[in-house]
Amino acid sequence: MKTPWVEKYRPQTLDDVVGQEQIVGRLKRYVEEKSLPNIMFTGFAGVGKTTCALALAKSLLGEYWQQNFLELNASDARGIDTVRNEIKSFCKLKAVGAPFRIIFLDEVDNMTKDAQQALRREMEMYTKTSSFILSCNYSSKIIDPIQSRCAIFRFSPIKAANIIKRLKYIASEEGIEAEQSALENIVYFTQGDMRKSINILQASTTTENTVTEEAVYDVISRAKPKDVRKIINKALNHDFMEARDLLRDIMIIEGVSGDDLITQFYQEVAQMTQEELIPEVEFIKLMEYMSECDYRIREGSNPRLQLEALLSKFLLVKQDA
């Protein structure tokens, strides 16, 4: 079985980390000082939080990093027992060939409040022998007593140019010919998520060792941006029936979900506003309509009916504005 590329090409050192230069610079200072306070990485998936944690641990702990490093995923182990047992057992052991031990707890925002309180107590108890690296998508879900005990690092989505450069490197290493348009579409759909981008690249690779635009669409099951923009333009220009027919083709024939389509609607409307194709006052109204549609779909309403109703509201934007 082939190794997933996301693991095969995971950066092993802080110098190899892509797109988080300021954060890497701050982490390198910890390596120089050979000390580590409790820290928290926060940001969306695929932006380098786990990679930075592993690279930092290897740099600080050296050849014995595996013996002195504990990684837990809070999605798999959310309860108080995990905090009290696994973390406590690990922290009680003396560091082997290293100045201290490191506990990396991923997806901490999925832990219950009681488990977070238990974690806070363990962080206080073993502060002289162990350091904690906490990772989460939403720091607002972490209790204040934990946040106040951590240096917080906020990870931004990785820039498109950095992701494309990395994808080209991987394609070159694997002997794959990737179309530029295919790479650009991967970046468009992943919105700064390096992990997802690499997974799509691997899944889109054909038996002929090529990555084409069509192969990318087959993997991600999303509508082409130009088709979404065509629907929006038709609706804004009062051609509702044509817009509705295009929408139905995408949902029924291509099998694109309502959740994905409403996200793409937002992306295209935002892009068109940036390009000054949609006035800001109209953008505000469109956002209101799209957010209402998104809410209704998530609450269980029929996605196609909600999106068709959204298109009918698009017809009203110019006269409302």
Curated annotation (Swiss-Prot):
GO molecular function annotations of the record: ATP binding; ATP hydrolysis activity; DNA binding; DNA clamp loader activity
Q: Pfam families under this entry?
A: AAA, RCF1-5-like_lid, Rep_fac_C
The entry's ATP-binding residues are 43-50
Q: Which SMART domains match?
A: AAA
Could you list this entry's UniProt keywords, alphabetically sorted. Answer: ATP-binding, DNA replication, Nucleotide-binding
Q: Which CDD domains match?
A: AAA, HLD_clamp_RFC
Q: Looking at the UniProt record for this protein, which Gene Ontology cellular component terms does it annotate, in alphabetical order?
A: DNA replication factor C complex
Biological process annotations from GO: DNA repair; DNA-templated DNA replication
| Quaternary structure note | Heteromultimer composed of small subunits (RfcS) and large subunits (RfcL).
Q: Which family does it belong to?
A: Belongs to the activator 1 small subunits family. RfcS subfamily.
Q: What does the function comment of this entry state?
A: Part of the RFC clamp loader complex which loads the PCNA sliding clamp onto DNA.
What is the protein's name according to its record?
Replication factor C small subunit
Q: Which organism is it from?
A: Methanosphaera stadtmanae (strain ATCC 43021 / DSM 3091 / JCM 11832 / MCB-3)
Which taxonomic lineage does the organism of this UniProt entry have? Archaea, Methanobacteriati, Methanobacteriota, Methanomada group, Methanobacteria
Tell me what gene encodes this: rfcS
